[in-house]
Amino acid sequence: MREAVLVQMTWPGAPTIYYGDEAGVCGFTDPDNRRTYPWGKEDKELIQFHKDMIHVHKTCQELLTGSLKHVVSDYNVIGYGRFNKDAQTLVVVNNNDSPMIKEVSVWELGVPRECAMEQLILTTKDGFTTKKTQFPVVSGRIVINLPPKSGIVLRHVNKQQGKKFLHFE
């Protein structure tokens, strides 16, 4: 579920959350297409993940109006960049049952050939983190190592724009 939310909040267009998705409500087909909201039994971690991803979406201008470029395409793996003149965001999702390591060309997104990209969020099958981690970019490429059923959002802000921090509450 978190992988889908990660893509939804970083893909072009206005993300839509259908009633109860943020709390883990599921359904099938009509008339069981949407069950009642699970008051008192919500998936609080999933709600927090939605809040954090909405914060990323609203705070990163390149996610609102930036360009899109596919940078990774493999079986059950997708990677793309969202970018503008000020910042670049890289999104990679591994929907496989096994870990993956990919070397990704990020210079095509406008990321400098020698710098670092900052992890904004990492989701795995066991949970998620907003812990800031630096990923080195060497010769315009970055190495992404993802566990099974996971996704990551990395960001670089151009120096002339100053460092813009995302603060999670």
Task: Give a label for each model feature.
Residues 5-8, 25, 75-84, 143:
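Short, surface-exposed beta-strand/loop micro-motifs that present aromatic residues
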Residues 71-111:
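Carbohydrate-binding surface patches
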Residues 133-169:
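C-terminal beta-strand-rich structural cap/linker in extracellular carbohydrate-active enzymes
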Residues 37-73, 153:
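Aromatic- and carboxylate-lined catalytic core of secreted/periplasmic carbohydrate-active enzymes
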Residues 5-44:
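Aromatic/acidic polysaccharide-binding cleft in carbohydrate-active enzymes
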Residues 22-25, 85-87, 95-98, 151, ...:
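Short, solvent-exposed loop/turn segments at secondary-structure junctions
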Residues 8, 20-22, 53, 90, ...:
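Conserved, mostly hydrophobic/aromatic
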